[in-house]
Amino acid sequence: MKKFLFLSILLAGCVHAMSQSGSAYSGDVDKAYGLIGNGAYKNGYKYLIKFANTGQAAINVKPNTSYLVFFVYDNTNHPATDFKAHLMTPDSALMKKYTVKPFDRAQIGVARGSQLEFRTPAFSGDTRPVKLVANPQAYIYVYYKK
């Protein structure tokens, strides 16, 4: 009887503990955002924009400017990733020429981050549109410096 009571209490405790544990992803994303921001600011970058968990985003880039883009995604199930930034243009040759792919940067808990860097050349006009593609969906953080 004591053994049965002990196992019942142990089982109830385990079930209670399992029901209390939620996803740590949002906390890990917040931690990654803080570390990313600190690193970017130390290297002279300024904050431009943050996109919530999304598969696509767009920014307008200025000439002669460096951009630093981070994709932070849930790596719980180790998904295959496809992140990139490319010039939004109907000309596929130009789009291919001006496409950048990131490299893996770090993992904080279940949040994994990829970093992408590019510098815009001198061009006529004020800005050019750049599309950011994230598969799987990711939080996207963009920083810039002249």
Predicted regions and their residues:
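Non-catalytic extracellular/lumenal accessory regions of secreted precursors
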Residues: Q20-G55
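Sec/Tat signal peptide C-region and signal peptidase I cleavage site
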Residues: C14-S19
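Short, surface-exposed beta-strand/strand-loop-strand elements in extracellular ectodomains
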Residues: N77-L94
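Short edge beta-strand/loop segments characteristic of extracellular beta-sandwich folds
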Residues: L68-V72
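Noncatalytic modules at the cell exterior or secretory-pathway interfaces
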Residues: T65-Y67, L116-Q137
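Sec-dependent N-terminal signal peptides
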Residues: F4-G13
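Solvent-exposed serine/threonine-rich low-complexity stretches and specific carbohydrate-binding patches
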Residues: K96-A106
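Beta-sandwich interaction modules
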Residues: I59, D104-S124
